[in-house]
A protein has these predicted regions:
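Helix-loop-helix hairpins and the membrane-proximal interhelical loops
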Residues: 1-49, 212-307, 451-454
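Alpha-helical membrane-protein architecture signal
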Residues: 12, 16, 191, 270-274, ...
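Helix-loop-helix junctions within the multi-pass membrane cores of secondary transporters/permeases
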Residues: 2-36, 57, 78-87, 91-139, ...
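Loop-to-helix transition at the N-terminal end of transmembrane alpha-helices
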Residues: 44-63
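Hydrophobic/aromatic residues within the transmembrane alpha-helices of Major Facilitator Superfamily
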Residues: 23-30, 63, 67, 144, ...
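Residue-level signature of catalytic and energy-coupling elements of molecular machines
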Residues: 19, 39, 123, 206, ...
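Membrane-embedded alpha-helical modules
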Residues: 93-214, 350-460
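Juxtamembrane transmembrane-helix boundary signature
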Residues: 58-79, 110
Length: 460
């Protein structure tokens, strides 16, 4: 049955590999179950309800990805988009969270229509192959940087970024943490990177997952030994699961279906909606390009088969997520961790979806996994994705320069979509001015995208 539905042999994989890949993807994404409620709670939303909405949106979206496209990609409320929702739209612009949810809902409906009419698929296929490889490399650097940041290995400083020290961390965050709070977690994260690296070199099956679990276990040992001292006020929580509230599922009632359609025809609403549309569109395309390139899923023309199903799953998940009460649900770049473990079909996604469903009942366990334990996974996955740099044609500067711009923009501007925007602009402008555009037969859609991106930077 699994073979027939997921075409395992055709995709050169087996059930064991797919399930392990799905578990790995979930473990690298589980942090969203803790982070999203924390961010959304800043708007006044009930954090328990947001946790339930987050888990359900991830469950439904990832399951739809498996059904519609048979791809090993997982979905959940996106980082960055949730921060824009909370800190810009609600806190910054002064709108209610219900109003912001309505914008997310409208975005989802528009994306469903765009997915059904092939607009999103056309955008995906219009991007040149060298630029697609660059997107994969850029995402690799981006998620490696996110991992280093989550582990506090790099912190803010006088040079913008610097290597960790307790003093630098305290100054950057305006707190008074000690070595037993933050210092030991940095050491554990570094140990985790080394351990995971050793497991990768030894080709141990499930190396990324084992790296997460071993790092977490070392943290628990340090907590028992008194080397790690939890301090909730500073964001350093106990590494032990907290079952004091039992296994009950937090109610969705406070946020379910709370859409506010009054004022949706205002200029502000259109601006908010466009921002959600833009970031989600190109973050999703960037993730699909990067992860599928790493998994060798692109065909000879650089196209991703069944992309319409993948984009439709993403759009429907966003719409459903808004009704449930969470920000934009999108394809997660952490899906690359499962792909690195050999995940190639929707069975990986189904496994991840099931674990998100189970997390509703076992939230204390999943919420106990600290960011320093998942950070090594992100760093190593970044290495895997960086390997696509060999597919970029560096002998042709008209191809190499746009690829370079795309790669460095993602980590430097902390945005996958910005990397794509700048890469597309650089590609079109450079090839147009140097007279290479006609020979390469750059698609009309690439010109349209470049113009739209330039207008975005001018007016937004």
């Amino acid at each position: 049955m699994l073979e027939k539905f997921f075409k395992l042999s055709e995709n050169h994989t087996d059930a064991k590999t797919e399930i392990l890949a799905g578990i790995t993807t979930f473990m690298t994404m589980a942090y969203i179950l803790a982070v999203n409620p924390s961010i959304m709670a800043a708007t006044g939303m009930d954090s328990g309800a947001v946790f339930t909405a987050t888990a359900l949106a991830a469950f439904i979206g990832t399951l739809l990805m498996a059904i519609f496209a048979n791809y090993p990609f997982a979905l959940a409320p996106g980082m960055g988009l949730n921060a824009y929702f909370a800190y810009t739209v609600v806190i910054g612009m002064g709108y209610t969270w219900q109003y912001a949810l309505t914008a997310v809902f409208a975005e989802g409906i528009i994306f469903i229509l765009l997915s059904l009419t092939n607009v999103r698929e056309a955008i995906f296929n219009a991007i040149p192959m060298n630029l697609k490889s660059a997107v994969s490399v850029g995402i690799g650097l981006f998620i490696a940087f996110v991992g280093l940041q989550n582990a506090h290995i790099v912190v803010g400083g006088s040079t913008l970024l610097q290597l960790f020290s307790v003093d630098a961390y305290n100054k950057a965050n305006g707190v008074e943490a000690s070595f037993n709070n933050v210092g030991i977690t940095v050491i554990l994260a570094l140990a985790g990177i080394i351990i995971t690296g050793i497991l990768v070199v030894k080709n141990i099956k499930g190396n990324i997952l084992w790296g997460i679990l071993i790092t977490w276990a070392l943290g628990i040992i340090c907590q028992f030994a008194g080397l790690y001292v939890p301090n909730a006020d500073l964001g350093f929580y106990s590494l032990l699961p907290d079952f004091s509230k039992g296994l009950s599922i937090p109610s969705l009632t406070p946020i379910f279906g709370k859409l506010q359609f009054k004022g949706i025809f205002s200029v502000d609403f259109i601006v908010i909606l466009f921002a959600f549309l833009f970031v989600d569109l190109f973050d999703t395309i960037g993730t699909l390009v990067g992860v599928s390139a790493k998994a060798d899923m692109l065909d000879e023309e650089g196209k991703l088969p069944h992309i319409k199903g993948a984009l439709l799953a993403d759009a429907v998940a966003t719409t459903v997520g808004a009704i449930l009460g969470t920000s934009t649900t999108t394809t997660f770049v952490e899906s690359a961790s499962g792909v690195s473990e050999g995940g190639r079909t929707g069975l990986t996604a189904v496994t991840t979806a099931i674990l998100f469903g189970l997390s509703l009942f076992l939230s204390p366990i999943f919420l106990a996994i600290p960011s320093f334990a998942t950070a090594p996974a992100l760093v190593i996955v970044g290495l895997y994705m960086l390997s696509n740099v060999t597919n970029i044609n560096f002998t042709d500067m008209s191809e190499a320069i746009p690829a370079y711009v795309c790669i460095i923009a993602m980590p430097f501007f902390y945005s996958i979509s910005e990397g794509i925007s700048m890469g597309v602009i650089a590609y079109v402008v450079l090839n147009l001015i140097t007279g290479e555009a006609k020979e390469k037969k750059i698609s009309a859609l690439m010109y349209v995208l470049a113009i739209l991106f330039i207008l975005k930077y001018i007016f937004l």
